[in-house]
UniProtKB/Swiss-Prot annotation:
Alphabetical keyword list: Ribonucleoprotein, Ribosomal protein, RNA-binding, rRNA-binding
NCBIfam families reported in the protein's UniProt record: rplN_bact
Signal peptide: none
Native organism: Halalkalibacterium halodurans (strain ATCC BAA-125 / DSM 18197 / FERM 7344 / JCM 9153 / C-125) (Bacillus halodurans)
HAMAP family, per the entry: Ribosomal_uL14
One Pfam family it belongs to: Ribosomal_L14
Annotated protein name in UniProt: Large ribosomal subunit protein uL14
Length: 122
């Protein structure tokens, strides 16, 4: 579960290294987000020469979460870290590579480009 002020690692090569969640999108009173949800973030750490800079406000989709997600068959999937991929308004990633595994739930939310770039889909 990601909420306001949560910090996430960035799982792409857009130039950002760490994000701070500003807002969870999808409803007026929505407090938490999980895998596959879009959030608004501020870039807290960035690498020099990247596409995004420190202080930029970006949209990101959550690809890994410490608090797992329950699947229809009753199983749960949890990850060791909270991670997100920076996306444009049309749900395409701003980076050209994805690092680490991503959850299968992204396919249900129409993030096919992220799923195809990921080295492993769990």
């Amino acid at each position: 579960m990601i909420q306001q002020e949560s910090r996430l690692k960035v799982a792409d090569n857009s130039g950002a290294r760490e994000l701070l969640c500003i807002k969870v999108l999808g409803g007026s009173g929505r407090k938490t987000a999980n895998i596959g949800d879009v959030i608004v973030c501020s870039v807290k750490q960035a690498t020099p020469g990247g596409v995004v800079k420190k202080g930029d406000v970006v949209k990101a989709v959550i690809v890994r979460s410490k608090s797992g997600v329950r699947r229809n068959d009753g199983s749960y999937i949890k990850f060791d870290e909270n991670a997100a991929v920076i996306v444009r308004d049309d749900k395409s990633p701003r980076g050209t590579r994805i690092f680490g595994p991503v959850a299968r739930e992204l396919r249900d939310n129409q993030f096919m480009k992220i799923v195809s770039l990921a080295p492993e889909v769990l």
